[in-house]
Amino acid sequence: MDTDILVIGAGLAGCACAAAAAEKGGKVTVVEKTSSWNGRGGGFGAINSHYMDELGIEVDKVNAKQHWIAQCASRANEDLIVKFFNSSEEASNWLLAKAEAVGGSAMVGAFYSHDDVYAEQPGYHMLMIPEEAGLTSTGFAGAELCYNDAVKDGAEFVFDSPAVQLVKDGTKVTGCICEGKDGYVQYNASKGVVLCTGDIGGNLEMCKAYAPICVEYGQPRSQYTDRKST
């Protein structure tokens, strides 16, 4: 199967990626191991969204980044943290526009820690979507909004299709092989493969390889975690 952009995983990240690529005209295929898209949690964190602007809330990005890195004992991926802070405003306003398009809005919560040592930043956004918008999930509305828009713009979602192996051309990842009900299917992406498969917290092998400090705290398992991974 050939596509432009292959997205592995249909959670919030995967649905958002698919929606963003499809709205720009890309041929997008999303493969997901469960039987539906997924979205959990009631809200999302953002830095300096337009809702925060309207409330007069401004986050000092430099101070907040330094505090975040310090709380992680300087073991975090600083490049990734910087990218979050620099891209958060644009990305959050993009998602908020999708909520507003169906008559929704967002509440910016004030329930965050003001402690000097474990201080948090304002910016928790809870999406408020009217019933007449017709959303079907009790999970995070943002994921469903992105899924609906991605489908509307032509993205294809293939469910019950876990990716079992990445396909490479030299050092470049060019696709993946999925195991579906009718056997194995190879997907080839001409423009890129995006991994949106969540964290590795439930995978003992990957924790040992990439985050051994996590191993001593035990490996939680949920319905989203392959029993063999633990």
Locate each region found by the language model.
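Glycine-rich active-site loop/strand segments that organize a redox cofactor
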Residues: 47-84
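Conserved redox-cofactor binding core of oxidoreductases
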Residues: 86-184, 190, 204-205
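Glycine-rich loop(s) and the adjacent beta-strand/alpha-helix scaffold that form part
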Residues: 181-183, 188-229
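Glycine-rich FAD pyrophosphate-binding loop
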Residues: 22-43
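Short glycine-enriched loops at secondary-structure junctions
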Residues: 34, 50-52, 111-113, 193, ...
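Loop/turn elements at helix/coil->beta-strand transitions in domains of secreted/extracellular proteins
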Residues: 2-5, 24-27, 152-156, 190-192
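Short, solvent-exposed loop/turn and secondary-structure capping segments
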Residues: 39-43, 49, 204-208
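N-terminal Rossmann-like FAD-binding beta1-loop-alpha1 element of flavoenzymes
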Residues: 5-29
